[in-house]
């Protein structure tokens, strides 16, 4: 009727075998007995005993029979008893092959779980579709081997504890056999709480925490555990598609990257660190793993998301909810650290946002090291010979959340999560088409490469360890950025933001965008399919129309031809899209500003160019990721290679620099970076007469007020730099320049810093004027071409 999942003859040929049958119904026992009869017929000289495996959390009395079977004196001799093989066996029930999405959702209803059918359903399955029933045998182990493991890893001493240990090992072996049939996406840690609480390692650490108890640690493990179920895993893709229903149903992958990651995950456990722009990211990663039949990830999320029915459902599909602000709870920190180490040791994959929270500006935030340090501790402690840090780039053609981000930038409060919030979030996804979701997997970073071998020097040097963690995390983030494709949304938004509310025609949009596309092609930067379509007028029209109706572009159709512009109230929303592509133009923008600075410099202009390029890199380091200093200089030199003998022309200065900039395509600094320096300048202006140790909240409030004044006066080009989000990093820049701390010369240095920023903004004006000259010349040439037709 059924066949075992594994070649059971390989594990039941021992002279003396105890079969532990994990059954829930008489039907399952009948199937196992039939399977066992086949084994006895194949191996008539072998002895096969069968015992029903006690269920989890069984009372002590239920273990009596197993305790007796494991006693050395139970067999003909103590030695033969220790050589006895233990083989766990179970019946697994497969879902129907043609199950629909509705069928996956219906599995949540009582009595509809296809993996755990009732006895009546089991008999019907055996009559109508017997292939859905499979007898699986877990990996065998000798009693002596199990007893040695028990003594080495646990603190227990009683023979009943040994029986419980054997039961857990049997269930774990069956779980491994089960996911080999169901697929790697069903792989998940089991029995974490009893395994950890029985661990000698865990108990020893617990004893070192004053006031810590096993009971309290157990409650924390219950809070962390995923409560995994097959039905919930099946629902991951269903819920993921529901949450992302406004996007194209098929995610966009790089198949070569997927193949490389699959090979890497077969060799080592991994932490998948994803870029975070939307709450949708939390479902994109699990769905991406399922789409590509890759092992699942166990994702960390804030416990604020564990509400209503979603909390239990997300927990059972692999979400690990963690508390916030755990610095004053040494027991919770210890339990969390050991939990992470246990999961890694068992070769399961973890995942969280490398940024720690959603980026509400569209650009990547600095990496957070909290959970990463726990994984590093597990590696350095020898719990794995290597752990891979797999970056995941997730980007979108559009997001509905940008409206919330724009309000937040203007000073609004964050909307609290809850059932109403969830309803509105999912509802918003279906209001219109948001385009594609792009998922990229750059080459993974090896923890061994950055931290050295386990038990190495870093275990004794916390400062060196933290520095290595920072370098490792920045490398992951850098690779994520390099793999992130440039989207049409970002390019169109960047262009329209530079016009400051002036509308452009389709031809103007199309002609102007070509320089950026040429640059991306020369640099071999990854671009989205939507960006590739910008080569045609139809592709530009589609991109502009997709952003129209205030999302965040306005289209005007009342004249001879349609025109598009960004209204002042939509600038913050458009900036999110623009910011998502800055990484591709960051270094070339710095080149332009350094050239503009060199034109006004006295003495060696080449030296002034390089000094200003490095200075701009230093000022922008809190907003953007950069290559290390050596690589950055090499990249800048490569950017300058577009102009032959550039150092000679730069040294001449004057009109030569004008010509160099006019010949450069594209000129991007005004579009990409001006707003950040305007935000810095607003904060610097506030600091002129602010207290030396002004607090962050007071500084932000004053900057918002002054920024609104500057907008009204036209002292900044738009309302975009008046943003709490930009002021937060502007304050970091000020702190780094030692401008928010008492000092004798503080007032003078604050004035000097403001003057420096104003000079940089003057350089922006200079480059912008040349860019406008390029635009006018391009339009004149295009008009001549149209007139000749």
Curated annotation (Swiss-Prot):
Pathway the protein takes part in: Phospholipid metabolism; CDP-diacylglycerol biosynthesis; CDP-diacylglycerol from sn-glycerol 3-phosphate: step 1/3
Motif (HXXXXD motif): 276-281
Catalyzed chemical reaction(s): sn-glycerol 3-phosphate + an acyl-CoA = a 1-acyl-sn-glycero-3-phosphate + CoA
Main location per the UniProt record: membrane
GO biological process: CDP-diacylglycerol biosynthetic process
Membrane topology: Peripheral membrane protein
Enzyme class: transferase
SMART domains: PlsC
Entry keyword set: Acyltransferase, Cell membrane, Lipid biosynthesis, Lipid metabolism, Membrane, Phospholipid biosynthesis, Phospholipid metabolism, Transferase
One MF annotation (Gene Ontology) recorded for this entry: glycerol-3-phosphate O-acyltransferase activity
Catalytic activity, EC: 2.3.1.15
Top-rank taxon: Bacteria
Localization: Cell membrane
Pfam families, A to Z: Acyltransferase (PF01553), GPAT_C (PF19277)
Cellular component, GO annotation: plasma membrane
Protein family (similarity comment): Belongs to the GPAT/DAPAT family.
Entry remark concerning the domains of this protein: The HXXXXD motif is essential for acyltransferase activity and may constitute the binding site for the phosphate moiety of the glycerol-3-phosphate.
NCBIfam families to which the protein is assigned, alphabetical: PRK03355.1
Protein name listed in UniProt: Glycerol-3-phosphate acyltransferase
Organism: Mycobacterium tuberculosis (strain CDC 1551 / Oshkosh)
Lineage of producing organism: Bacteria, Bacillati, Actinomycetota, Actinomycetes, Mycobacteriales
């Amino acid at each position: 009727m059924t066949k075992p999942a594994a070649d059971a003859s390989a594990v039941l040929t021992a002279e003396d075998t105890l079969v532990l049958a994990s059954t829930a119904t008489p039907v399952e026992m009948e199937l196992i007995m039939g399977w066992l009869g086949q084994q006895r017929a194949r191996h008539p000289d072998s002895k096969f005993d069968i015992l029903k495996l006690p269920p989890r959390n069984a009372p002590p009395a239920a273990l009596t029979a197993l305790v007796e079977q494991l006693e050395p004196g139970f067999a003909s001799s103590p030695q033969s008893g220790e050589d006895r093989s233990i083989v766990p066996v179970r019946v697994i029930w497969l879902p129907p092959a043609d199950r629909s999405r509705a069928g996956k959702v219906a599995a949540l209803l009582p009595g509809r779980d296809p993996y755990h059918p009732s006895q009546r359903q089991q008999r019907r399955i055996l009559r109508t579709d017997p292939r859905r029933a499979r007898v699986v045998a877990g990996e065998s182990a000798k009693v002596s081997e199990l007893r040695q493991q028990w003594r080495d890893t646990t603190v227990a001493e009683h023979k009943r504890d040994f029986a419980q240990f054997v039961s857990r090992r049997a269930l774990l072996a069956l779980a491994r056999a089960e996911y080999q049939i169901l697929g790697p996406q069903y792989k998940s840690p089991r029995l974490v709480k009893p395994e950890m609480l029985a661990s000698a390692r865990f108990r020893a650490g617990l004893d070192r925490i004053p006031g810590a108890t096993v009971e309290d640690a157990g409650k924390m493990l219950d809070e962390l555990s995923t409560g995994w179920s097959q039905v919930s895993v099946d629902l991951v893709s269903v819920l993921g598609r529901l949450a992302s229903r406004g996007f194209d149903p098929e995610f966009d992958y790089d198949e070569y990257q997927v193949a490389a990651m699959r090979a890497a995950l077969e060799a080592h456990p991994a932490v998948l660190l994803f870029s975070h722009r939307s709450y949708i990211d939390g479902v994109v990663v699990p769905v991406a793993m399922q789409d590509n039949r890759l092992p699942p990830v166990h994702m960390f999320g804030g416990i604020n998301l564990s509400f209503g029915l979603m909390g239990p459902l997300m927990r059972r599909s692999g979400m690990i909810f963690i508390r916030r602000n755990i610095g004053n709870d040494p027991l919770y920190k210890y339990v969390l650290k050991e939990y992470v180490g246990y999961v890694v040791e068992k070769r399961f994959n973890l995942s969280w946002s490398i940024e720690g929270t959603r980026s509400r500006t569209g650009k990547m935030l600095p990496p957070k090291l909290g959970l990463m340090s726990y994984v590093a501790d597990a590696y350095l402690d020898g719990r794995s010979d290597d752990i891979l840090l797999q970056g995941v780039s997730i980007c979108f053609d559009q997001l509905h959340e940008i409206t919330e981000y724009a309000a937040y930038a203007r000073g609004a409060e964050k909307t609290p999560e809850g059932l109403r919030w969830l309803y509105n979030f999912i509802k918003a996804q279906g209001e219109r088409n948001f385009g594609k979701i792009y998922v990229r997997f750059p080459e993974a970073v090896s923890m061994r490469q950055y931290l050295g071998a386990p038990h190495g020097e870093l275990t004794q040097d916390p400062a060196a360890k933290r520095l290595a963690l920072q370098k490792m995390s920045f490398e992951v983030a850098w690779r994520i950025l390099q793999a992130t494709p440039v989207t049409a949304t970002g390019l169109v938004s960047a262009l329209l933001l530079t016009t400051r509310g002036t509308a452009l025609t389709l031809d103007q949009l199309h002609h102007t965008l070509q320089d950026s596309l040429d640059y991306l092609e020369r640099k071999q930067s990854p671009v989205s399919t939507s960006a590739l379509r910008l080569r045609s007028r139809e592709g530009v029209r589609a991109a502009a129309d997709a952003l129209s109706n205030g999302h965040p572009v306005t289209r005007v159709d009342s004249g001879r031809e349609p025109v598009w512009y960004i209204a002042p109230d939509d600038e913050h929303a458009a900036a999110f899209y623009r910011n998502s592509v800055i990484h591709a133009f960051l270094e070339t923008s710095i080149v332009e500003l350094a050239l503009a600075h060199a034109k006004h410099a006295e003495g060696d202009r080449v030296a002034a160019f390089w000094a200003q390029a490095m200075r701009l890199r230093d000022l922008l380091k809190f907003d953007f990721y950069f290559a290390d200093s050596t690589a950055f200089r090499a990249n800048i030199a490569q950017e300058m290679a577009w102009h032959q003998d550039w150092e000679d022309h730069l040294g001449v200065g004057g009109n030569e620099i004008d010509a160099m900039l006019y010949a450069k395509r594209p000129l991007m600094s005004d579009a990409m970076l001006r707003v950040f320096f305007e935000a810095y300048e607003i904060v610097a202006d506030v600091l002129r007469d602010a207290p030396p140790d002004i607090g962050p909240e007071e500084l932000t409030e004053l900057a918002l007020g002054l920024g609104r004044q500057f907008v009204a006066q036209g002292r900044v080009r738009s309302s975009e730099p008046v943003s709490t989000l930009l002021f937060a990093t502007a304050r970091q820049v000020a702190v780094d320049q030692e401008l928010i701390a008492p000092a004798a010369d503080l007032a003078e240095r604050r004035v000097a810093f403001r003057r420096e920023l104003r000079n940089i903004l003057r350089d922006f004006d200079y480059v912008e004027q040349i860019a406008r000259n390029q635009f006018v010349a391009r339009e004149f040439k295009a008009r001549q071409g149209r007139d000749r037709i």
